[in-house]
């Protein structure tokens, strides 16, 4: 558990940060990610500057950092995984800080290597929880995922039966709860990202490791989120064929659901670090994927205005 910062010893640390200097009491952008690799990409870039020597605060074991990213005011936090950690940490961020919108960057696996390969960055248009299952009783009505279809060497009956993919219930302040499957990225921010990143050049090499091709930004795909990593090619193909999902991760849908429930703008940047069913990329390629996703997130952040509060 991280050591407590000076602010964390105050009665109301967040309020104190916001009151102590009116110049920082404005709406910030929330930057969230899950891993040490993601945080290292941010720190290695040299683009982040803390507001002061003591501009971090610990809440519920998470450390929140206030500063600027290439001149844009942000609060960033490493959430950890799986999805419940992302949702919990993001909710704390939105409740305790003045956040205008949420930017997530992180790693994902490609489910379609014809579309995306390691080093590419995906900016999906919609994400979904594909790990919420209704596991059917053997011999009952068939669900979408039929385990017998994957018997080897021949298809047939399987005691695991079938699985139906469930919708999730979304709550919001202004609407009655509703069941949804696909969670759309904020349209205005998605459009802004496509404009800001349309000619973006990504990094091809890190240390002595270079990608075999020129990495690219891919717009408009769909993404799958669950609490398990998709390394199996057959299941990756199933998600691609049945849901048109091109990437899979453990966090994006949590970002979407929490942001939508709080009526906050949000966008997702995924650095592709592997292809389902193929040999896992080495640590340098994985870091390069994180770094490219971070670069895309930063360029987007610097392209949008941040509203100010009255005290400015």
From Swiss-Prot:
Q: Where is the signal peptide?
A: 1-24
- GO function terms (MF aspect): catalytic activity; nutrient reservoir activity
Query: At which residues is glycosylation annotated?
Result: 70
Keyword check for Glycoprotein, yes or no: yes
The answer to whether the entry has keyword Glycoprotein is: yes
Keywords attached to this entry:
Glycoprotein, Signal, Storage protein
The induction text for this entry reads: By photoperiod. Short days stimulate accumulation, while long days inhibit.
Q: Matching InterPro entries, A to Z?
A: Nucleoside_phosphorylase_d, Nucleoside_phosphorylase_sf
Q: Name one GO biological process term.
A: nucleoside metabolic process
Question: What tissue expression does the UniProt record report for this protein?
Answer: Bark.
Function field: May play a role in nitrogen storage.
Q: Which PANTHER family does its entry note?
A: NUCLEOSIDE PHOSPHORYLASE DOMAIN-CONTAINING PROTEIN, PURINE NUCLEOSIDE PHOSPHORYLASE
Q: How does it assemble?
A: Monomer.
What family name appears in the similarity comment? To wound-inducible poplar endochitinases.
In Swiss-Prot or TrEMBL terms, this protein is called Bark storage protein A
């Amino acid at each position: 558990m991280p050591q407590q910062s000076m602010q964390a010893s105050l009665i109301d640390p967040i309020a104190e940060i916001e009151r102590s200097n009116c110049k920082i009491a404005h709406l910030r952008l929330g930057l969230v990610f899950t891993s040490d690799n993601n945080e290292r990409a941010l720190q290695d870039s040299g683009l982040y500057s803390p507001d002061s020597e003591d501009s971090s605060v610990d809440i519920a074991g998470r450390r929140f950092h206030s500063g600027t990213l290439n001149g844009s005011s942000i609060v960033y936090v490493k959430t950890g995984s799986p999805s419940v950690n992302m949702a919990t940490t993001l909710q704390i961020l939105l409740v305790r800080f003045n956040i205008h919108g949420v930017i997530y960057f992180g790693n994902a696996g490609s489910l379609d290597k014809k579309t995306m390969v390691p080093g590419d960055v995906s900016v999906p248009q919609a994400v979904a929880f594909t790990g919420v299952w209704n596991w059917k009783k053997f011999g009952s009505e068939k669900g979408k995922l039929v385990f017998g279809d994957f018997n080897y060497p021949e298809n047939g009956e399987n005691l695991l039966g079938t699985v139906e993919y469930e919708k999730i219930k979304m709550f919001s302040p202004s609407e009655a709860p509703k069941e949804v499957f696909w969670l759309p990225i904020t349209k205005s921010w998605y459009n802004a990202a496509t404009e800001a990143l349309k000619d973006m050049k990504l990094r091809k090499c890190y240390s002595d490791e270079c990608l075999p091709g020129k990495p690219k930004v891919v717009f408009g795909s769909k993404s799958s989120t669950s609490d398990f990593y998709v390394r199996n090619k057959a299941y990756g193909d199933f998600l691609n064929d049945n849901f048109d999902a091109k990437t899979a991760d453990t966090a994006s849908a949590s970002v979407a659901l929490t942001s939508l429930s709080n009526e906050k703008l949000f966008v997702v940047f995924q650095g592709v670090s592997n292809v389902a069913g193929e040999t896992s990329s080495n640590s340098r390629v994985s870091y390069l994927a994180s770094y490219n996703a971070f670069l895309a997130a930063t360029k987007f952040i610097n392209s949008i205005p941040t509203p100010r509060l009255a005290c400015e």
